Regions:
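Short, basic/aromatic recognition patches that contact phosphate-bearing ligands
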Residues: 1-60
Length: 60
């Protein structure tokens, strides 16, 4: 999966749920948790309003 497609998928997954963990995103996208962390950081840098709580998960 290309990175652009993965970033789009992350946004879609976060929109449809209350809280989503990095582990859940990694399993759904078949990537490492480190890749999820990098992708979340890239989205946040682009201005996507993602909120994250350590040990809890991410939401939009």
């Amino acid at each position: 999966m290309r990175r652009a497609d993965r970033l789009f998928q992350i946004v879609q997954l976060l929109r449809g749920r209350r809280l989503t963990t990095a582990d859940d995103l990694a399993q759904r996208l078949e990537v490492s948790m480190r890749t999820v962390y990098r992708d979340i950081a890239a989205l946040a840098q682009q201005g996507v309003p993602i909120e994250g709580e350590a040990g809890v998960g991410y939401r939009m």
